[in-house]
Amino acid sequence: MTAALGHLVVEGLGPIRRVELDLTTDITVLIGANGSGKSNLVSALELVSRVVDNTATDRLTRQAGVARQYFDGPSGSVDSILIELTQEKSSNNGLSLTYRTRIENDINDQPLYTEELTFQDNSGTPPLFRQEFGPSQHSAIQRIACDPAHELYGAVESFIPLVSSCRVFHFDDVSANAPVKGFSTVGDDIYLRSDAENIAAYLLKVRNDHPEHYQRIVSAVR
């Protein structure tokens, strides 16, 4: 079973100068004033997943470029974004795996990603292993995940499902043209899209294949 996310660090993203969170429970509730960075903190998780699956560049470009995402406040400005995820100790021989990505912009405001993997045990001593990749326009982690012969394949293989599941879903659009109110094909049911465009097809699949989970959803809505 994939180990859970245990610790999150975000630096330099939007209004966030630096935030550290211990994610030790199944549900984490974020409370803060408007503009304090709650949505940015959640978006950081999705951004990491998109770095790993090589779709972050398109996302950042559609958001007016990398530099526009940097923190800029009374305490100064930054020239990069840092996101760090630590996986709880699991199948990696009792070791915790930390993945870190630093996102910078080149002269054309295109993103460059520097990734780092670190393994640590309970002793508190220096890391048992640390390796940095990049800067590059593509994820080294994704490349390793596609290469069973790579020495880090086993560790990355257990990490990919965790980071790939970090997606943000926005269901609060109630306008006439909201994607959730549109049509979707029955076959578009492999995964739930972030804008809920295919929610009808997806719920149909859940109802047919996982009726217990479907009833839990129905009960929660009611």
Residue ranges and their predicted role:
Residues 30:
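Hydrophobic anchor at the beta1->P-loop junction of P-loop NTPases
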Residues 38:
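Conserved lysine of the Walker
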Residues 27:
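Walker A (P-loop) ATP-phosphate-binding motif of ABC ATPase nucleotide-binding domains
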Residues 1-17:
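N-terminal pre-Walker A segment at the start of P-loop NTPase domains
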Residues 33:
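P-loop (Walker A) phosphate-binding loop of NTP-binding proteins
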Residues 91-222:
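Electropositive, glycine-dotted interaction segments
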Residues 19-23:
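Conserved A-loop
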Residues 42-108:
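Conserved P-loop NTP-binding catalytic core
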